[in-house]
Regions:
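Residues at or immediately preceding the N-termini of alpha-helices
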Residues: 27, 41-44, 63, 259, ...
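ALDH superfamily catalytic-core signature
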Residues: 225-368, 432
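Residue-level signal for inorganic ion chemistry
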Residues: 30, 66, 88, 163, ...
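Conserved C-terminal structural/oligomerization subdomain of aldehyde/semialdehyde dehydrogenase
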Residues: 29-35, 215, 252, 306, ...
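Rossmann-like NAD(P) dinucleotide-binding subdomain of oxidoreductase/dehydrogenase enzymes
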Residues: 120-261, 389
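Short, well-ordered beta-strand elements within core beta-sheets of diverse protein domains
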Residues: 33-39, 54-60, 140-141, 251-254, ...
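Structural signal for hydrophobic packing residues in well-ordered secondary-structure cores
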Residues: 55, 59, 74-81, 85-88, ...
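N-terminal Rossmann-like NAD(P)+-binding subdomain of aldehyde/semialdehyde dehydrogenases
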Residues: 1-127, 321
Length: 471
């Protein structure tokens, strides 16, 4: 059993004022594997005070000093790779294909921030003026359970690169990852108060961060509903806010697509992170003229996807993170059937060969229209919908007929045509014949998928405001 009794404030591990214990589960077995003691509002206020006190000195550090600090962070986090790998399997149920990436990404995203900082221009001319990028102050960083260690490191690296100090509220469901990352960051020998990590509930620690007048910036990744609440709270003190929220991403298969090349990309995009990804391509738009052919190919591919023990090398989809999430996904599968969608693969219940744990059968629906619940709401599980279109214009219209706009994919043999389609999609990121990630490019959403951008120079700039000096 893992027992986590401390949080990190002002350069040291301390016992929280909060007394609530939160059970940690292994989702592959549905068994309790530990407990974490949660922080409360008092702890959050202590962390904010520490970050506020550290800000004047940190904001005056040079670019070279910040680069050196980030390099120490990178080395310390990279050294904990094996411990992170075990944690993401044990507390998250990530299969081998995903857990290897999740264990490497926290260090990788710090390295990406170092590259962005090395070329970032803090002072630029603008006519007769000089524009100086100025750090905002204390940043509240709120991270989700579906890639907690990576988000902690990515948001913190960008904030520190900009000259901000930080209070981090990680997901209480990811306490093992958080503990490992916190220990690593402590070993990086950053000045006390520059970063503080306070594990607690959103309605206590998160609420305090989003309302506190001494917090100048909030960077949040999570659900759209929580993002709306943060925006309302932040408005009271005019906080700057970056929100990376939900999605219902379309994958458009054009009528000239090579299915042998496209189907593996469709499956990987739809089922990434066991379907628990905001960018998952869960709406598969297919031309009516090739619908029958594509249904067969997709049904065969989904049926071949193995859901089960994350420690088995053949497993491609692990369990849902919690019983609550498992029940949510089951409810959406029932809703799809009730609304008249036709099941091509999967369905309710657990996959064959699994008895315990929160496993879901990889599921594929067809005869779906874009007004059905399963086509409009973010399910956050391995459930895909085939939606037919008559022509290219209708494909674009269906892709854009959503309150979300985080990510999209266009697959077709004619790359020029696919890029023209991509330009018409209202989304923060559109991938054309690839699933590659470009860390130098901005990442974030349109519409209800968020506010602002992360990654690259945009990620650093999000923690700053431009100051014009004339004369």
């Amino acid at each position: 059993m893992h027992t986590i009794e401390q949080i990190f404030i002002n350069g040291e591990f301390v016992t929280p004022h909060g007394t609530e214990r939160f059970d940690l589960y292994n989702p592959a077995t549905a068994q309790v594997i530990g407990q974490v003691r949660l922080a409360d509002e008092v702890d959050a206020e202590r962390a904010i005070a520490a970050a506020k006190a550290a800000f004047p000195a940190w904001s005056q550090t040079t670019k070279l000093e910040r680069i050196a600090a980030l390099k120490r962070m990178h080395a310390a986090v990279a050294a904990r790779h094996d411990a992170l790998l075990e944690a993401v399997i044990e507390e998250y149920g990530a299969p081998a294909s995903r857990s290897a990436w999740m264990a490497s990404y926290p260090a990788e995203v710090i390295a990406q921030a170092i590259e962005a900082l090395e070329v970032f221009e803090f002072v630029t001319p603008a006519g007769a003026a000089t524009v100086q990028m100025t750090p905002l102050g204390v940043a509240g960083l709120i991270t989700p359970w579906n890639s907690d260690a990576g988000f902690i490191c990515g948001k913190l690296a960008a904030a520190l690169a900009a000259g901000c100090t930080a209070v981090i509220k990680p997901s209480e469901m990811s306490a093992l990852q958080t503990q490992i990352v916190t220990e690593a960051l402590r070993d990086a020998a950053l000045p006390p108060g520059v970063f503080n990590i306070v594990t607690g509930r959103g309605e206590t620690v998160g609420e305090t961060l989003s309302r506190h007048p001494d917090v100048a910036k909030i960077s949040f990744t999570g659900s759209t509903n929580t993002g709306k609440a943060i925006l309302r709270n932040a408005a009271e003190s005019f906080k700057r806010v970056t929100l990376e929220l939900g999605g219902k991403s379309p994958t458009i298969l054009l009528d000239d697509v090579d299915l042998a090349r496209a189907i593996p990309l469709v499956i990987q995009a739809g089922f990434m992170n066991s379907g628990q990804a905001c960018v998952a391509g869960t709406r598969i738009l297919v031309p009516q003229s090739r619908k029958a052919e594509m249904e067969i190919a997709l049904a065969q591919a989904v049926a071949a996807v193995k859901s089960g023990d994350p420690r088995e090398s053949a497993t491609e989809i692990g369990p849902m993170v919690s019983e609550k999430q498992w029940l949510r996904v089951q409810g959406y599968i029932r809703k799809g059937l009730d609304e008249g969608a036709r099941l091509l693969a999967g369905g309710e219940g657990r996959p064959d060969g699994t008895r315990d744990g929160w496993f879901v059968r990889p599921t594929l629906f067809t005869d779906v229209n874009n007004q059905m619940t399963i086509a409009r709401e973010e399910i956050f599980g391995p459930v895909l919908c085939i939606i037919p279109y008559q022509d290219e214009a209708e494909a674009v219209a269906i892709a854009n007929d959503t309150e979300y706009g985080l990510s999209a994919i266009v697959l077709g043999r004619d790359t020029g045509r696919a890029r023209r389609v991509a330009q018409q999609i209202v989304s923060g990121r559109v991938l054309v014949n690839t699933l590659a990630h470009e860390p130098k490019a901005p990442f974030g959403g349109f519409k209800h998928s968020g506010v602002g951008r992360e990654m690259g120079e945009w990620g650093i700039g999000a923690f700053m405001e431009p100051k014009s000096i004339v004369g």
